[in-house]
Amino acid sequence: QRQMCIRDRGMRCHGLKGGIGSASRVVELDGKPYTMGALVLSNHALFDDLIVAGTPIHTLLSDSIPPHEDKGSIITVLATDIPLSERQLRRLCRRALVGLSRTGSACGNGSGEIVLAFTTANRMPHYSEKALLPMEMLHDDAINPLFRAVAECVEESVLSSLLHAETVTGNHGQTFRSLTELLKNRA
């Protein structure tokens, strides 16, 4: 059971209640499992653009979502234990937009897409008797599975933020509906 946190209280994603969502994938490299994870704070995109598993959601729901602009932003944090260079982490950040587009986000003019990535690999000692330290790094030819994992994680994180959100009414009387509630009402 996920609980809404104070930070995601007023988030609107695709015109519905958004907020915090997360997902992860295990990627095997040289016979060893590594984890790629994504965490999003979703506050972006239009309802009519929302796609789940290739289906435009607005075609399934008769509920009317008030018109709104594609303003706000989505903040994405990618975390992994795969040994990556700073350049490779930047490349993963760019692939996060693939996951957003799978949910129907057009990354509009009023929307900001912020993506940060880090790795916990290659921990450096605070003190060392050696001037040069060894560092592992993924070969670029092996990075494609990570691109796919990032796209899948970001897509699932956005959907997670929508499915785990609860309908809320804000200070100004504006209600942000929960996708889960809308889907239950359809059944």
Predicted regions and their residues:
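Glycine-rich, flexible loop/turn motifs
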Residues: 12, 16, 46-48, 53, ...
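Internal helix-turn-beta structural module
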Residues: 127-187
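Short, small-residue-biased leader/transition segments that mark boundaries at the very start
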Residues: 1-6
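Glycine- and Gly-Pro-enriched alpha-helical subdomains that act as flexible
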Residues: 25, 32-90, 99-105, 122-124
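Conserved phosphate/anionic-ligand binding catalytic regions in large, soluble enzymes, centered on
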Residues: 10-26, 106-109, 151, 155
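Hydrophobic alpha-helical bundle architecture
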Residues: 76-148, 171
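A glycine-rich phosphate-binding loop feature that marks nucleotide/adenosyl-phosphate handling sites
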Residues: 7-11, 112-119, 174-182
